[in-house]
UniProtKB/Swiss-Prot annotation:
GO terms for biological process: cellular response to sulfur dioxide; regulation of cellular response to stress; response to starvation. This is Zinc finger protein YER130C. Keywords: DNA-binding, Metal-binding, Nucleus, Repeat, Zinc, Zinc-finger. A zinc finger (C2H2-type) spans 389-412, 418-440. Residues 337-383 are annotated as: Disordered. SMART domains: ZnF_C2H2. GO terms for molecular function: cis-regulatory region sequence-specific DNA binding; DNA-binding transcription factor activity; DNA-binding transcription factor activity, RNA polymerase II-specific; zinc ion binding. InterPro entries: STE12_transcription_factor, Znf_C2H2_sf, Znf_C2H2_type. It is found in: Nucleus. GO terms for cellular component: nucleus. Residues 338-359 have a biased composition (Low complexity). Residues 363-378 have a biased composition (Basic residues).
Length: 443
């Protein structure tokens, strides 16, 4: 907005500036002038400052056509009653691209309020010539030594009526909160400790103490400043804690009869919603580990009550196992085993005795199939037609008969007919004896 709203006139006499304060006498004198040269008359505003007029650059261009053009450039000059100002870069309205603000350089008085109580939200209603309509804070006004005194001098009502979003944004940029308290020490301490709510860390909102009691969770929420979130999620936290976590408080499990324990387990498993309303719901929570133990105890007790074969007076009786062979057969088996080992001669027994003992042992072993030895190789699972000789005590099969006899003698009959002549140690196989004799030769 220029102080000289200029207008172009094509004339042979004069090009003049048309203003509201222009005088008709000058116009008449210029019309009556008979000279053939051009003159330019600029009538300054009565309220304009002489220094500001000298500083304004009004460029006059002669286009050599007989017309004098005054360049209508945008010159922003301030009046004498207005402070020096500049365009502000601290805050913008993103929704309005044509919005701009001025920022003043001058210093305010200490008693002058920082903001005007009458906030103007519309840009068209802002008077740039009026200092009270421009809602900006300069960098000089935020000095610590000079500008912290307006917090006490400004009334509380005026601060509460500040509803402009621009003012709140400006305050958040400089990171301080207006505190209208009277105590200076408390104010200085709070100025360094208090932080705006928008600056709070996001992780503080997720610090939900679901493991602690209700009193400790309330104290933690008050210290962290999460009161609204705590009130909204209190019911959900309580439900979550009651369903999935056990309390820290020691719960005493009383010894109850079997029927009452089953009722307690059923009620605690399905009636959780009824206990959510009361404060003593934490005591109703049962340790899951103890529930598993109780289930095992209940199962064992029920089995013992129903089918206990050792309890007197029950309907079921223990069936005694029947021996598959008599005592006489046991004696014969022991005698057959002890005969070859107790023989004093180192040589093998006679064929007649060996055949009789082996045949007798085979007969005995056929009756006692449950006394098999687990030592040795596992039975061959793949059937082989070449292995025609099968063991009668186990599922092993052999290609040669002597291998079958050696297997039965060593594993099933536990016979050791081969004795070392040096240390009198018995062996069931001749190859094992030969290896043993080599150990004596090395000595």
């Amino acid at each position: 907005m220029s102080l000289y709203p200029l207008q172009r006139f094509e004339s042979n006499d004069t090009v003049f500036s048309y203003t509201l304060n222009s005088k008709t006498e000058l116009f008449n004198e210029s019309r009556n002038n008979d000279k053939q040269h051009f003159t330019l008359q600029l009538i300054p505003n009565a309220n304009a400052n002489a220094k500001e007029i000298d500083n304004n650059n009004v460029e006059i261009i002669n286009d050599l056509t007989g017309n004098t053009i005054v360049d209508n450039c945008v010159t922003t000059a301030t009046s004498s009653n207005q402070l020096e100002r500049r365009l502000s870069i601290s805050d913008y309205r993103t929704e309005n691209g044509n919005y701009y603000e001025y920022e003043f350089f001058g210093r305010r008085e200490l008693n002058e309020p920082l903001f005007n109580n009458d906030i103007v939200e519309n840009d068209d209603d802002i008077d740039l010539n009026n200092e009270s309509d421009v809602l900006m804070v300069s960098d000089d006004e935020l000095e610590v030594n000079e500008r912290f005194s307006f917090l006490k001098q400004q009334p509380l009502d005026g601060l509460n009526r500040i509803s402009s979003t621009n003012n709140l944004k400006n305050l958040e940029i400089h990171e301080f909160i207006i505190d209208p308290t009277e105590n200076i020490d408390d104010e200085l301490e709070d100025s360094f400790t208090t932080v705006p709510q928008s600056k709070k860390k996001v992780r503080d909102y997720f610090k939900l103490n679901i493991f602690g009691s209700s009193s400790s969770s309330n104290n933690n929420s008050n210290s962290l400043g999460c009161e609204p979130i705590q009130t909204e999620n209190s019911s959900s936290q309580k439900m979550f804690k009651n369903r999935f976590f056990r309390s820290r408080k020691s719960t005493l499990i009383k010894s109850l009869p079997l029927e009452q324990e089953n009722e307690v387990l059923i009620n605690s498993g399905f009636d959780v919603s009824s206990n959510e309303e009361s404060d003593e719901s934490d005591h109703a929570i049962i340790n899951p580990l103890k529930l598993v133990g109780n289930n095992k105890d209940i199962s064992t007790q029920s089995i013992a009550k129903t089918t206990n074969p050792f309890k007197s007076g029950s309907d079921f009786k223990m069936i005694e196992p029947v021996s598959k062979f008599s005592n006489d057969s046991r004696k014969d088996l022991l005698a057959a085993i002890s005969e070859p080992s107790s023989s004093p001669s180192p040589s093998a027994p006679s064929p007649s005795v060996q055949s009789s003992s082996s045949s007798h042992g085979l007969v005995v072993r056929k009756k006692t199939g449950s006394m098999q030895k687990t030592r040795g190789r596992k039975p061959s699972l793949i059937p082989d037609a070449s292995k025609q000789f099968g063991c009668e005590f186990c599922d092993r099969r052999f290609k040669r008969q002597e291998h079958l006899k050696r297997h039965v003698r060593s594993l099933h009959m536990c016979e050791k007919p081969f004795t070392c002549h040096i240390c009198n140690k018995n062996f069931s196989r001749s190859d094992n004896l030969n290896q043993h004799v080599k150990t004596h030769a090395s000595l």
